[in-house]
Design a protein with these regions (language model features):
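Basic amphipathic alpha-helical segments that dock to polyanions
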Residues: 57, 61-64
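Glycine-centered, phosphate/nucleic-acid-interacting loop/turn motifs that mediate DNA/RNA or nucleotide
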Residues: 68
């Protein structure tokens, strides 16, 4: 399925391409939290992602927005209100996140069993 000479392009390896979109310590967790909400504001998202700095959250959200997985809506209000949600492409990751969670449970149980 993957050809190493084509790098991270879709033609080279769809798995590498997909992992490139969601790689990093926080992106999958951000996508999971956004998947649980219709829309969420920055501070609420940061509270749910215990340990993430505002700089890292901003950077990760910007990268996910550039990848067209996340939509950012800024309202012309004072104080400013910004809400984040998944795009249709972002929502399409749902079954894969759930499958990853199921695999995580199996791996956890196997590791605990020794």
């Amino acid at each position: 399925m993957c050809s190493s000479d084509l790098g991270n392009t879709m033609e080279g390896c769809p798995v590498k391409f997909a992992l490139g979109l969601v790689s990093g310590k926080w992106k999958l967790r951000i996508l999971w939290e956004l998947n649980q909400q219709e829309v969420i504001r920055f501070n609420e998202l940061q509270r749910r992602l215990e340990g993430i700095s505002s700089v890292m959250l901003s950077k990760s959200l910007e990268e996910l927005e550039r990848a067209r997985l996340v939509h950012r809506e800024q309202y012309p209000e004072i104080p400013p209100r910004v809400e984040y949600s998944l795009t249709a492409l972002g929502r399409s990751i749902d079954p894969y996140l759930r499958a990853l969670g199921e695999w995580g449970m199996q791996a956890y149980e196997a590791i605990q069993a020794g």
